[in-house]
């Protein structure tokens, strides 16, 4: 019995030690040197623009994005932007942020990505809570498809009003 108990304890201690040595993320500066989250935030506070590159289907990057946003918003004015929103959906996004439509209304009005609720909604709702602007930064799909099929010259064929998106 003692043998089984000792094996059980050693097994779980090993798992705990292994789990502690595998962080969910590691941060590096521009020179490839590891930096702490605290140091990164201290440096980002001094910047006018912070661009956050992320993998669309990586929940850790979205969690980190929200954490950075919360820490920066506590220190300075912040404006958000995301390519998951297309520019022609800006008004619906503004209406949601202003409380004129519900989350369900936003879902009906905008072409949301499949991971919106889990990965992007927390950031959008944080912007809403802070009354911070949120910019729809992506080109509308129909124009992206047009360029993909016919090249950038195809944009010359669309009306000037359409180009305001």
Go through each PLM region and give its residues.
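N-terminal, post-signal-peptide region of Sec/Tat-exported proteins
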Residues: 45-78, 84
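Solvent-exposed loop/turn segments at secondary-structure junctions
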Residues: 55-59, 85-89, 140-144
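N- or domain-start disorder-to-order transition segments that initiate the globular core
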Residues: 18-47
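Bacterial Sec-dependent N-terminal signal peptides
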Residues: 1-23
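A substrate-binding/cap region within the structured catalytic cores of diverse enzymes
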Residues: 79, 92-165
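Solvent-exposed, acidic/flexible segments
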Residues: 33, 37, 58-65, 90, ...
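Post-signal peptide N-terminal segment of secreted/secretory-pathway proteins
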Residues: 57, 65, 69, 91-101
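Short, basic, glycine/proline-bearing loop/turn elements
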Residues: 21-26, 48-55, 104-111
